[in-house]
Amino acid sequence: MRSLIVVLGPTAVGKTKVAIFLAKYFQSPIISVDSRQLYKELPIGTAAPSIVELNQVKHYFVASLSVTDYYNASKFEKEAIALISNLHQKYQTIIACGGSMLYLDALCRGIDEIPTIDPKLRMNILSVYRKEGIDSILRQLRTHDPTFYNLVDLKNHKRVIHALEICLMTGKPYSQLRCGNVKKRSFNIIKIGLNRERQELYNRISIRVDKMIENGLLEEARRVYPYHHFNSLNTVGYKELFQFFDGKYTLDFAIEKIKRNTRIYSRKQIAWFKKDKEINWFYPNNIDEFETSCLLDTISHKSILLT
């Protein structure tokens, strides 16, 4: 049976390096599972694969959309599964790589169909939002779906409101609806998780952000600032710089906020992934070395068990 090897883990842990190693070893392409690397205007702030890396291995779902395009995990699931089906006609093994939690769940587990919201319910929720503010909505979401409450960006009011709409419409937690029923895939899935000691990961995050600034993140953010109201740009690395452009932050403070918010996001990723008992975890000894033989042995062993 054909396989999909999924390399996942928190931001800045070193997923791309491992994914490219595996892609070269298996002579296969890479499917990016990153909800922001999709956007062609954001190569620096999303740590998208470099031109050299893209030339080394064929990547899919990288720089394929504009920030003005609407996209979600449901669309990704449909397109990625169709692509994998086609690629498996040529490749025995395909590599997927990313850290976007909902997109990974969409790929590996599938997403239930999201129902259409009753207009009256939507009006009622929006009325509460206008009268009482986002805090009232957040309290309700925490009651109905504490899992998604701990995952979502609480400053993304649109996403918070939509999640509450789904909870009240279906009587089920939004997080459960998104990945409650596991869809059987036509291929084996082997999950490789990467993690590091917390302080080492934090140091890598800090170094990465500094390099992003050196490489032109400020200019990149300025170019997309006219589109800052799009959900694609409501993400760490850009929203903080938009505050700087608006005169609300100093540049130094914005950079520190990027580092802090990235650390927070990494903790959410780790907490989310730790719930998945199918993940085979690896902890590199230092920032440059990775025990590739152990990794390949694990993949081989899992492949045998799944056949």
Curated annotation (Swiss-Prot):
GO terms for biological process: tRNA modification. It is an enzyme of class 2 (transferase). Its cofactor is Mg(2+). The record marks S100, R122 as: Interaction with substrate tRNA. ATP binds at G9, P10, T11, A12, V13, G14, K15, T16. It catalyses: adenosine(37) in tRNA + dimethylallyl diphosphate = N(6)-dimethylallyladenosine(37) in tRNA + diphosphate. InterPro entries: Dimethylallyltransferase (IPR039657), IPT (IPR018022), P-loop_NTPase (IPR027417). Substrate binds at T11, A12, V13, G14, K15, T16. The keyword Nucleotide-binding applies. It holds the Pfam family IPPT. Residues 34-37 are annotated as: Interaction with substrate tRNA. One of its GO terms (molecular function) is tRNA dimethylallyltransferase activity. Keywords: ATP-binding, Magnesium, Nucleotide-binding, Transferase, tRNA processing. Its EC number is 2.5.1.75. HAMAP family: IPP_trans (MF_00185). Catalyzes the transfer of a dimethylallyl group onto the adenine at position 37 in tRNAs that read codons beginning with uridine, leading to the formation of N6-(dimethylallyl)adenosine (i(6)A). Monomer. Belongs to the IPP transferase family. This is tRNA dimethylallyltransferase 2. It comes from Azobacteroides pseudotrichonymphae genomovar. CFP2.
